[in-house]
Amino acid sequence: RSVQEAQERCAELRVMIPHATYASYAAVDYLEKVSSIEQLHIHIREGGSMEALDHVLRQGYHLALLRYAVEDDEHYTHYCARRGLKMEPIMDFEYSLLTNRDGPLARKEIRDLSELDKYMEILHDDFQLPGEDGGDGIRWHVNDRRRVHVSERCSQFSILQRMPTAYMWASPMPKRALEQYHLVLRKCPAQRQRMKDVLVYPDRGTLRPEEQTFVQLLHKQAALTVK
């Protein structure tokens, strides 16, 4: 009984998420839920899919949200199945242009990706672009002329807020984040890369209460995004 009581007084969760605003909002929602618990041992880390898998398989993380192209689904499905990881779909989407609400791209429909070359592309500093670095170069458009790598999300949003000619490729976002930074998501007919966000975790029957709570909040935030 004393062990059970100690567990009830301690919330422990280790989760990996991609650079996704809705996922970080879910993490904050979770922290609000558990803020009154006596002890908190929470680790929230952002990174790519392979890093996330490594943290779940080898470093004791409980949950990992993977983000990958739809055409890579079979690879990740087989990879997770061989390693005893359960997969839970969260969201399918296509990237949109994220830009200043009053900027030229907010009013322009991009029919050819070369039209973006005169604007400034903001990228996550650790983002690996499909097709880049020796790949076929087809799966992702890269603005080779005007690129700025930024590692921190708030800095990226501040740049987009201050510079109307800057843009990012972004996944669906919470409406309140768009309003806070005076940004807009614009669908781009020229960019049709389909993506998946899939939650993975060790298949041990049932999730712990902490994990269940986070998963519920993640689904809730995903449903509230602007696509």
Explain the meaning of each model-derived region.
Residues A26, T206-L218:
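Short amphipathic alpha-helical coupling segments at ligand-binding clamshell hinges
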Residues R1-E8:
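Alpha-helical "hinge/linker" immediately C-terminal to small N-terminal DNA-binding modules
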Residues L57-H62, D126-L185:
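Hydrophobic hinge/microswitch elements
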Residues Y79-E121:
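Flexible hinge/capping segments at coil-to-helix
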Residues S24-D29, D73, D112-V142:
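Secondary-structure junction motif
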Residues D102-D112, A190-Q193, R204-E211:
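Short helix-loop capping/hinge motifs at secondary-structure junctions, enriched
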Residues R82-E88, F93, C154-T206:
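Beta-alpha-beta core module
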Residues E8-D54:
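N-terminal winged-helix
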